[in-house]
C-alpha cells in the first residue's frame, strides 16, 4: 500500500512474473488504465494473467450491474489477462437455495461475457459458501448449476480447509471443474494462513489430482 512500485519490482526480482490483480476500480487497475498497466508490467518483465473482481447477486433487469461486467471484461482483456475471477461469495445477498441457483445463472452469463472477450471466468472460494443451506452446500450447488464450458472454479486450498473440506475430495467429486488454483496453507487451528509446508494442507495429495482437476494455472 505504501510502495507499489518497490513491491512490484521485488516480486519480479524473486521470480514472480505472472501476476493476478485484486484492484480493479472505476475502469482502472491500481489507478492505472488497462493500457498503462499492461505497459507498466511489460517494462518490469511481467504480465497480468488474472484479475479478482466481482459483484453481488444482481437483480432481474439490473442493466448497471451487467454494464459493469461488460466493461470489466473488456478492460481485463485489454490488460492481457486470461482469467477474470469473481473473488468471493455474496453471502449477504443469499437467503435461500433459490438465490444460490440465481447466482449460478449469473455466473453462466458472466462466463458468456468473458468468453466474448477472449477470457475465462472463474469463481474463487472462501468459507461462507461451505455453510449448509437448506440441507445443501452452496458451493456444490454452484458447481452443479454452472456450465463447465463457461465457468470454472479457482480453488483456494486454505479456505477449503477453513470450510471443513479438502481439495482432493472436491476434485474427485467434480473432475475437470478446477482449472485455476490459489495455493495457500492453513494453520493447525484452521483459522489463519501460514507459509506453504508449515500448515495442515496436504499439498502432496493436491498435486496428485492436478490433472483430474483440469488445472491450467
Language-model features, listed with the residues they occupy:
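Histidine-acidic metal/acid-base catalytic patches
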Residues: 1-15, 80, 133-155, 159-217
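Stable alpha-helical elements in mature extracytoplasmic
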Residues: 4-7, 33, 37, 69-72, ...
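Conserved beta-strand positions in the central sheet of alpha/beta enzyme cores
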Residues: 20, 50-52, 85, 122, ...
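Histidine (H) residue identity feature
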Residues: 52, 124-126, 131, 168, ...
Amino acid at each position: 500500500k505504501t510502495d507499489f512500485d518497490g513491491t512490484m519490482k521485488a516480486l519480479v526480482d524473486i521470480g514472480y512474473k505472472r501476476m493476478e490483480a485484486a484492484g480493479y476500480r472505476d475502469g482502472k487497475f491500481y489507478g492505472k488504465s488497462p493500457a498503462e498497466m499492461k505497459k507498466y508490467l511489460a517494462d518490469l518483465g511481467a504480465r497480468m494473467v488474472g484479475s479478482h473482481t466481482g459483484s453481488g447477486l444482481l437483480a432481474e433487469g439490473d442493466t448497471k450491474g451487467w454494464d459493469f461486467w461488460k466493461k470489466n471484461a473488456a478492460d481485463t482483456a485489454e490488460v492481457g489477462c486470461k482469467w477474470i475471477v469473481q473473488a468471493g461469495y455474496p453471502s449477504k445477498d443469499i437467503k435461500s437455495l433459490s438465490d444460490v441457483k440465481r447466482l449460478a445463472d449469473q455466473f453462466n452469463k458472466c462466463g458468456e461475457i468473458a468468453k466474448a472477450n477472449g477470457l475465462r471466468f472463474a469463481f474463487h472460494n472462501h468459507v461462507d459458501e461451505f455453510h449448509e443451506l437448506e440441507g445443501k452446500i452452496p458451493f456444490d450447488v454452484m458447481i452443479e448449476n454452472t456450465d463447465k464450458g463457461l465457468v470454472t472454479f479457482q480453488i483456494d486450498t486454505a479456505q477449503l480447509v477453513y470450510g471443513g473440506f479438502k481439495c482432493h475430495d472436491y476434485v474427485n467429486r467434480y473432475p475437470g471443474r478446477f482449472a485455476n488454483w490459489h495455493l495457500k496453507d492453513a494453520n493447525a487451528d484452521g483459522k489463519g494462513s501460514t507459509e506453504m509446508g508449515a500448515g495442515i494442507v496436504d499439498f502432496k495429495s493436491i498435486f496428485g489430482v492436478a490433472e483430474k482437476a483440469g488445472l491450467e494455472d
